[in-house]
Amino acid sequence: MRRNAAQWPEKTAFSTLDGRTLGFGTFDRRVNQCNHVMQALGLRPGARVAVLSRNRVEVVQAFGLTKSGLVVVPLNWRIAPAEVVKILRHCAPDALIVDAHGQKLVEPLRGQLPEGLQLLSFDAAQSGWRLLADLMDSAPEDEDPSWQAATQEIACIVYTSGTTGTPKGAALTHDGLLDNARTAAADMLGLDPTDQVMAVMPLFHVGGMWYHLFPCFAAGCSILLLSDFDAGVVLRELQDRRITNVHLVPTMIAALLDHPDAAHADLGAVRMLFYAASSMPPQLLRRAMERFPSCGFAQGYGATETGVLTVLGPEDHRRARDSANESLLASCGRPFSQREMRVVDDEGRPLPIGAVGEIQVRSAGRMRGYWQDAQATDRVLHDGWLRTGDLGRRDDDGYYYIVDRRNDMIVTGGENVYPNEVEAALFADPDVQEASVFGLPDPHWVEKVAAAIVLRPGAACDPQALLQRLRTRLAPYKCPKTIFLTDALPKNPVGKVLRKALRERYEGEPR
């Protein structure tokens, strides 16, 4: 932030659809003011500041609180209010900053929030909330905060639900974030200060942080910040603003290609389209490469806990297209420099090339551990290696392929959904006796959430009515797209439900 403000003070750092622009110099001054406000409220290095908001410039300014050693905790605004409260009570922040949507989300449960929590709003404040902009206007803007960040300390805590649905906060250090930012900017996205980047991924997600925000800071790019994805708007802005670099998930790419404006939109300025969150069906990737003929394509592999790890770059995509070698497109690429990866068996012993096992990683960008959860940390960290829980293999050329997810996680529309969490919500319904949740292939979502349920004796439940009740307990993207009623669930001899058998049974079902 300091370097960009000194080198390009008048250059646009951020712009928005409503015509707002913010230069690097002004942005740095607003960040200073935000830090001074927090210090005046009594926050000191190590204090947590939770942020619950859709994408907007003020969210980026809040990330700048790391400048004074504060720890930023970005929250998913799509989750249910009870889930937000659970995370807030776990990380015990000193301040919560929200937009109007976030305020509406937590207001009904305000009595359950941690005691002493400073309540701040980006928008009009209700009773008990303070408007952050008013506090910032009287704060110093040309002075760096008196407290400074230590590079080895925690900068962010990013929450990811565990397989049991228990929230786990990955503690990411300043050094780790900087390592990921520089690696992504130079080796994955090929950014330079002339790039115009469209940021549409949510900033509470590492996809928005690692593939938009932090790499653009590292390279000095200008960012068009969108609050939501709308295919027509994205096509228009790609064309009119001459966007050069954009990161989308496969579901978004499919929506762009299917939009009526796609056929005549001028997308010639786009030189890099990065996709992640899930693999892309080969037929969809072929369509995208035909529609963006002069654009380089890249995809990466990583996780909240690991940082960015691999890239399948533009040259790999061109080689796969020109040689009709579609199998390469199923790869997540090769590791970056200073990233170590290996495939191991259940005992942690390295496996030979081609063998399938768990992928483990070692890198400067990985998390320090899970916040306030030593047991969960010990389960995934051992001798410097992080156990990803992903099953994969490596080929002779060093390319990695993700084969399956050991924990049965579902990636739908770029969002991670854990079956046990959805099952717990289903089990809470009075009509449900047994339930199992699994992923099924879907042409739009790539993978959709599906559930097979056994009703309680005497229950006559309509699946749509069950879904309506479920939406009061879970975020919409976690709710099953399809519910199958069955008399019994397939189980192994010890009574464990066989999700693989359910996937095989229902794959291709029209319902």
Tell where the protein language model's regions lie, with residue ranges:
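Conserved AMP-binding A3 loop
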Residues: 21-26, 155-179
